[in-house]
């Protein structure tokens, strides 16, 4: 059976095919928005296309689209209880990559539900292959720009946890405005979290780790439960700390291994939702 309340996810165009143009809705003019990701190929090799055709209806949500392949129409919303067919604690992963972390968590915790937002179609296809191979049913995937979609996709206090593991670091100074973790995104995550819920982040770029820590501590709706802990001598504020121990549920993915092999270390950062009045 397909995902309740959603059409089966359409396949990306075959290699060499021209995608159908998408006109602006309502005759409006589309205004470019700074994105936290780069445009990557949507083409799938034959084996991943077969996987997509076979299992996408079980896992992939097809929303009404706005302007652009990764945008979600502002009048489209998800009801997790309808989508998953039950009421269970929800974790949202922003940027699931190939699904190593997500599928491992879903297999370990069948009593929880997991919603992935990802823009890289080959990564989604690999996630689907892993999910089907593991036999997990508590995953749903949405091809979407999270920063654009989340403000209208889900109700307040929907999620137990939000994960942002190893987002694009945008290393060049002129590109850092593209980083996903920002003050405005923190407010959106806080809106989604239930009281006491947590935002878990990890990065292996030191300056992004310091930024994540600073974003959490500047957000009026989040608390850093590890304030002052694990000071980093390389930090511009070396005595400040504010870093969490490694989350026990965060596996060492292929992506993290590449960073370790390059001599980078991972920082974990946590923001806890301050209870609503």
Name each model feature, range by range.
Residues 195-203:
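Conserved beta-strand signature within the Rossmann-like core of class I S-adenosyl-L-methionine
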Residues 214, 218-277:
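Class I S-adenosyl-L-methionine
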Residues 1-26:
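Compositionally biased, low-complexity flexible segments
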Residues 181-195:
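A short glycine-rich, Lys/Arg-flanked "PGG" loop and its adjoining helix->strand segment in the class I
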Residues 159-179:
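A short SAM/SAH-binding and catalytic strip from SAM-dependent methyltransferases
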Residues 151-161:
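A short acidic, Gly/Pro-enriched loop at the edge of an enzyme's catalytic core
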Residues 89-148:
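SAM cofactor-binding core of SAM-dependent methyltransferases
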Residues 28-92, 100-109:
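S-adenosyl-L-methionine
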